[in-house]
Every structure is written in structure tokens, then in C-alpha cells.
Amino acid sequence: METTTKTINGFELLSIAGTVNAIQENPAVAAFELRVENTWVTGGHNQSKIQGFYGACQEDTSRETPFILDNDEPPVLMGNNLGANPAEALLHGMVGCMTTSMVLLAAANGIEVTAVTSR
């Protein structure tokens, strides 16, 4: 017999419940240490490498290849548009976190979301 996993908004409901229960039993599970290494290239251009992090009481090694992100400035700020500027990258992170949290909370409450745009 095949078992199907119930998902809402792309999240498995059993995983949501398991995560909540794990945090309630051991609040240290919720502590995360995120890391980034940034290297200046030239002018306003720099590059960040993101790979490992500590979370859920363990070191995460699931990323075999690091994420590489470029930051730069627009020409008006003496850059070459080789990437979003650092303030834009920060905004991307904030709205991404807000959007994911909202959709996850909706899923945890059984609410299906069909579309979201955050600004």
C-alpha cells in the first residue's frame, strides 16, 4: 500500500508538526548560526560564498557546492551592475523570509495559498 504525504503550499504537514514538537521539547533546536564569507573583487563588486551552517543542534553539510552571490553597485554609485547592491540583497532576504514564513504559517493552519507577492 502506498502512503501519500499531505502537503499544503509545498510544505509537508508532518514535517511542520515534527519541527514544532522538536522545538517545544528542546528549544535549542531553534538556534541557528548562519555563515557567509565575502571577498572584495574590485570597485563596488564583491562576492559572497554561502555553504555550511549550524542548526537543529548539528552542523549542516547538505550543500556540496556553495551558493555564490555577487554584489555590486549601479553606475550612478560607481559600480557595474554585476549584482544587486548590498541593500537590495538585504531587502531580498527580508521579503523572502517574510513570504516563506507567511506561507508556512498558512500551511500549518491548513490554509492553501495560491499566490503571494511581497514588497
Locations of the language-model features?
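Aromatic- and glycine-enriched beta-alpha-beta binding-site module
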Residues: T99, V103
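Alpha-helical metal-binding/catalytic segments enriched in His/Glu/Asp
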Residues: M94-M98
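Extended beta-strand/beta-hairpin segments
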Residues: M1-H92, L104-R119
